[in-house]
Regions:
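Anionic, Ser/Thr-rich low-complexity intrinsically disordered regions
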Residues: 1-202
Length: 202
């Protein structure tokens, strides 16, 4: 089984599990062994799924401002958790390929494998929710047709992205490409780099 076939299966399981209750406060019950890549992939997609629904809720024009601020804080934390998890997944890949002999003419990729996996997780969410739109009983046929066309593109994109990730991993394994990972260095959550926060400490 290719890496992305496994990843897409885990992503779909996480999305389906979330929608059993469809509640942003539902505690996660990760079915995979702690420390396994499946565990990290499931957690990654769970975070993405919860945040997807955060973003829906905060766009409600009738939302209470206090509630919106609290939700924005949760979104900020979710973004940081997501970034941390991507870096954990890259650490997994570095461990897997640590003994690979890199070829003299090896090239670097534009992004690390885990950031491509991040996009694959989001794509699984887009596909799930676009399918919902296609199946909406009260929606017009015009709406369903438009959404079906979009769904077809998303499914094609999923195939292409999955293929690209698997090919990248094959190239890394063969030494034709090498991983170079940079920390994201987000500044807005850091009290020492966000001017609003560090100016309050004066």
């Amino acid at each position: 089984m290719t890496f992305t076939k496994k990843a897409n299966q885990v992503f779909n399981q996480a999305i389906d599990d979330y929608h059993v209750f469809d509640n942003i406060n539902t505690p996660i019950k990760n079915p995979f062994e702690e420390g396994s890549i499946e565990n990290r992939l499931y957690l990654k997609c769970w975070i993405d799924t919860v945040q997807w629904h955060f973003e829906d809720i905060i766009r409600d024009p009738q939302i209470d401002p206090v509630e919106a601020l609290a939700l924005k804080r949760r979104i900020d934390k979710s973004n940081q958790d997501r970034t941390d998890l991507v870096e954990q997944i890259d650490s997994y890949f570095r461990e897997v390929y640590k003994d690979v002999k890199v070829l003299p003419d090896a090239r670097i990729n534009t992004e690390s494998p885990a950031w491509a996996v991040d996009r694959l997780s989001i794509l699984a969410l887009k596909i799930y929710h676009m399918k919902e739109q296609v199946m909406r009983p009260e929606a017009s046929e015009e709406h369903k047709t438009k959404c079906q066309n979009k769904l077809n593109v998303l499914l094609e994109q999923q195939i292409d992205l999955s293929t690209a990730i698997d090919q990248l991993l094959e190239d890394i394994e063969a030494g034709r490409k090498y991983m170079k990972v940079y920390k994201q260095m987000k500044m807005y959550n850091d009290p020492s780099t966000n001017p609003i926060l560090y100016n309050q400490q004066k």
